[in-house]
Amino acid sequence: MLTRFTRLRPILQLRYLAQNSHIEEEYFEELEPTGIISSHETSQEPPKRTGFRSQNLSEDADFVENVVGALTDQRAKDVFVVKSEETEMTPYTHKIICSAFNSRQASAISENLRSLLKIDGVSNGSMSHARRSTKRSNGWYVSEVERVQVHVMSEECREKYDLEAIWAGDDRILDEIDEEKQKILLPPRR
């Protein structure tokens, strides 16, 4: 017979780690530049932009495997990983999409992923910058973990938005998007 303590032991361990370890949360705000740019400043060339992908790609692959492992441990299903191309102007090296049975489980997966990665970062000595950018939704939660973007979606949201087809470059989806843009831009018939 299981006692209450043994059934709740993993939860108590997570609570103990969260309470007894120093976890910092960082929130970033973009500040608008103050001041007026003079004409002689605009004639100068902008500074060279360094790429987002200057870190080791094998470390990124290992990190993505850890994130996918954490998602499967949380019972996420249909995990789909998309590697961003070098030509894309995105700070993310990988995008991960997974499904949950309902929106409540999607919220729990997103929150548990964030807390597990923070606890893992504290134990390894490196702070993992994990933040959840979706506060309330109808089953779609987006988390940004270092250079990986994680989408946890309910089945209905995943079927509705079909991000895999858009990111994979499915021509059928891209043609539908172009048709919708044309409908919007055409003047109404009289």
From Swiss-Prot:
Top-level lineage group: Eukaryota
Classification via Pfam families: RsfS
One CC-aspect GO term: mitochondrion
InterPro entries found in the cross-reference section: Iojap/RsfS/C7orf30, NT_sf
GO BP term, example: IRE1-mediated unfolded protein response
Disulfide bonds: none
Coiled coil: none
Record GO terms (molecular function): ribosomal large subunit binding
PANTHER family for this protein: IOJAP SUPERFAMILY ORTHOLOG (PTHR21043), MITOCHONDRIAL ASSEMBLY OF RIBOSOMAL LARGE SUBUNIT PROTEIN 1 (PTHR21043:SF0)
UniProt similarity note: Belongs to the Iojap/RsfS family.
The protein, known as: Uncharacterized protein K12H4.2
Organism expressing this protein natively: Caenorhabditis elegans
Gene name of the encoded protein: mals-1
